Structure formats: structure tokens, C-alpha cells
């Protein structure tokens, strides 16, 4: 009896992780599609990546393994490096071309 109640609560908690993950993923994808500012697009991308991390932790809690948390930490480190490179590119574009929006970057030629 107690085991079934505990398993129902665990499934309910895991479903809450996935609901939160899908909401954050939707907000991140919406921000990437609608916004024109490069920094806002980068923040939306980070939000979408963090939603995937929440899903990894939810899967980890369901299976009682630590693999999801390790993968989430690895993804956080990778996202930090990606954000640093992205901000560097955005700052150099702003310094050289005064380009803040995506529409101003489309005209760049290599």
C-alpha cells in the first residue's frame, strides 16, 4: 500500500518536471523565433537548453540513476562555453557594424 502511494507520488513529481521542461522549451523556442535582438535570442537558446536539463533530471528521478544529473552538469558546462562564444561574436559584431538585430547581420558578406 505504501509502495504504491510512493510510486504514484514519484510519477506525479516526474510529470511535473516534464511539464516545466516543456513550458520552458516552448518559451525558449518562441523567443528564438519572435525576437530580433541577438542577445535576447541567445538568452532564449539558453532557456531551451536548460529545459532539456530539467528533462534529464526528471528522467534521472524516474530511473533512480545518476546518469541524468551527470549529463545535465555536462550540458550546463557546454552551454556556458557556447554562451561565452556567442556573446563574444555578438560583441564583435556590435563593435564593428553596430549590429544589434538579426536583420542587420543578414547583409554581412564574408
Swiss-Prot record:
<keyword id="KW-1278">Translocase</keyword>
<dbReference type="GO" id="GO:0030964">
    <property type="term" value="C:NADH dehydrogenase complex"/>
</dbReference>
<dbReference type="GO" id="GO:0042773">
    <property type="term" value="P:ATP synthesis coupled electron transport"/>
</dbReference>
<keyword id="KW-0874">Quinone</keyword>
<dbReference type="Pfam" id="PF00420">
    <property type="entry name" value="Oxidored_q2"/>
</dbReference>
<keyword id="KW-0472">Membrane</keyword>
<keyword id="KW-0830">Ubiquinone</keyword>
<dbReference type="InterPro" id="IPR001133">
    <property type="entry name" value="NADH_UbQ_OxRdtase_chain4L/K"/>
</dbReference>
<feature type="transmembrane region" description="Helical">
    <location>
        <begin position="14"/>
        <end position="34"/>
    </location>
</feature>
<keyword id="KW-0812">Transmembrane</keyword>
<comment type="subunit">
    <text>NDH-1 is composed of 14 different subunits. Subunits NuoA, H, J, K, L, M, N constitute the membrane sector of the complex.</text>
</comment>
<feature type="transmembrane region" description="Helical">
    <location>
        <begin position="70"/>
        <end position="90"/>
    </location>
</feature>
<feature type="transmembrane region" description="Helical">
    <location>
        <begin position="39"/>
        <end position="59"/>
    </location>
</feature>
<comment type="function">
    <text>NDH-1 shuttles electrons from NADH, via FMN and iron-sulfur (Fe-S) centers, to quinones in the respiratory chain. The immediate electron acceptor for the enzyme in this species is believed to be ubiquinone. Couples the redox reaction to proton translocation (for every two electrons transferred, four hydrogen ions are translocated across the cytoplasmic membrane), and thus conserves the redox energy in a proton gradient.</text>
</comment>
<keyword id="KW-0520">NAD</keyword>
<dbReference type="InterPro" id="IPR039428">
    <property type="entry name" value="NUOK/Mnh_C1-like"/>
</dbReference>
<keyword id="KW-0813">Transport</keyword>
<protein>
    <recommendedName>
        <fullName>NADH-quinone oxidoreductase subunit K</fullName>
        <ecNumber>7.1.1.-</ecNumber>
    </recommendedName>
</protein>
<dbReference type="GO" id="GO:0048038">
    <property type="term" value="F:quinone binding"/>
</dbReference>
<dbReference type="GO" id="GO:0050136">
    <property type="term" value="F:NADH:ubiquinone reductase (non-electrogenic) activity"/>
</dbReference>
<keyword id="KW-1133">Transmembrane helix</keyword>
<keyword id="KW-0997">Cell inner membrane</keyword>
<dbReference type="GO" id="GO:0005886">
    <property type="term" value="C:plasma membrane"/>
</dbReference>
<comment type="similarity">
    <text>Belongs to the complex I subunit 4L family.</text>
</comment>
<keyword id="KW-1003">Cell membrane</keyword>
Amino acid at each position: 500500500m505504501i509502495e504504491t502511494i510512493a510510486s504514484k507520488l514519484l510519477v506525479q513529481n516526474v510529470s511535473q518536471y516534464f511539464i516545466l521542461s516543456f513550458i520552458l522549451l516552448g518559451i525558449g523556442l518562441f523567443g528564438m523565433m519572435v525576437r530580433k535582438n541577438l542577445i535576447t535570442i541567445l538568452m532564449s537558446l539558453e532557456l531551451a537548453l536548460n529545459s532539456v536539463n530539467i528533462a534529464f533530471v526528471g528522467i534521472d528521478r524516474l530511473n533512480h540513476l545518476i546518469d541524468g544529473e551527470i549529463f545535465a552538469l555536462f550540458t550546463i558546462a557546454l552551454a556556458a562555453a557556447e554562451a561565452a562564444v556567442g556573446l563574444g561574436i555578438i560583441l564583435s559584431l556590435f563593435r564593428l557594424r553596430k549590429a544589434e538585430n538579426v536583420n542587420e547581420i543578414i547583409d554581412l558578406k564574408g
